[in-house]
Amino acid sequence: MSDLDKWVLHGDEMRRPLLVNPKLGESSKLVIVGGGLSGLCCAYRIAKKRPDVEVIIHEQSSLLGGVISTWKEDDWICDVAVNASRPHPAFWRLINDLELGEILKPSKSDAKSRWILLDGKQHKLSWRTLFKIGPMKLLRSIKKARMGELSVAQVIPNKQIADAMCLGIVNETSENVDADFLFPSLTKFGQNPPVKKSKLNKLISKSYPIFTPKKGTIASLEGGMQTLVDTLSEQISNLDNVTVFYGNSADSPSAIATTYDVPLESVIWAAPNPDIDQDSSKISIFAIGYTEQQVSHIKKGYGTLIPDVEFPISGILHESDVHASQRCSKGHRLFRLMVPHNRWDNDLNSVQECAESLLATNPIIFKKIGERQIPHYKPGHMSKLSQISLDCSYVGWSYSGVSITHVIDQSERIAELF
């Protein structure tokens, strides 16, 4: 496969380090530690491509799927973790191969607007946002960022806007987030494509199965993202060369290699690295719903980011505005609230009071639907990945990032080695 072909398949994911032992592709038997989305995708891609390779999934819990889950109550539907995918052909290819194309829907055309709450006022993100940041300051910061290992705060010279962007993606403020990790194309991290960006984008656009997404849209699955991991789990269970073992912890890659009698290079570690001290933050997710009349004053859009630490809520996502598939009954609207634990006193009332002040009083439903733990990606994260000893291979959220496209594309790149 040519370098250009790889870039058409994977796009800017090619900039991210692939933490794979060079002998992995020679394995006749391999063990994947972790049955979350990353582990499931790796197992599916490798097992389908190489029916002669024995694939074992070692999952410490009693269920596959990891952090991906969808909350449902009556007609209300809300994803607890990832709720959609940005345009990337790897996600489209997986959905197509799983025969889920009929339930993959682009986001609604009237829900593109995004806002940031700045000094108590909603600011719509647009080209005008550049003037709040300062175009010349931004240009100088971007040039400086190409030296590597800078924080997002050092690249985006407006703390509130930089914090909002980071909180919306990794639940952390901008001084603690690696700019190379969040904007590898902007900082020119890693290798560059062999053709101009405009030409590459045209080639990538032509490669989508199912439908070609429009610029600025996202896509989601009818019924929520749990459908994806449920379908992966079901299809993997029907593959003769895949076995899943549940309920046992995994102390280290070497211990797993001994347990399953495989060489260390045949272990894929799809879990946090036990040898790396990677901090994390916790966030609670709430669903809140109203009649359309109650929130008629709330403009339709994608959502609002809130960098101000005086608010327990860091983001409000307009779930029913964005998704083309039903998220609530007709005549209602559903919102998802993101509540970082370092901004919250653990009192449910404080979240509801804040939400009501920002949306409307007397919601029809208000419920905490889950908690999640998000790894930190501190400045220098991407550079440090290249220093990891690759006695085995590493995949997943802890390395690539929290976007669903990262881990799905990562599994394709690994399967190419077989």
Model-derived regions: residue spans:
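Mid-domain catalytic core of redox enzymes
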Residues: S2, N248-E353, S357
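Conserved flavin/dinucleotide-binding core of flavoenzymes
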Residues: S2-L24, E319, S325-F418
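Glycine-rich active-site loop/strand segments that organize a redox cofactor
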Residues: K6-W7, G66-F91, M136, S141-I142, ...
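Beta1/beta-strand and adjacent pyrophosphate-binding region of the FAD-binding site
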Residues: L24-S38
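Glycine-rich FAD pyrophosphate-binding loop
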Residues: A47-W71
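Short beta-strand to alpha-helix junction loop
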Residues: V82-A90, S141-I161, P209-E234
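Mobile amphipathic helical/loop "lid" adjacent to a hydrophobic cofactor/ligand pocket
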Residues: P87-S198
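Helical element adjacent to the flavin cofactor pocket in flavoenzyme catalytic cores
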Residues: P194-S254, V262
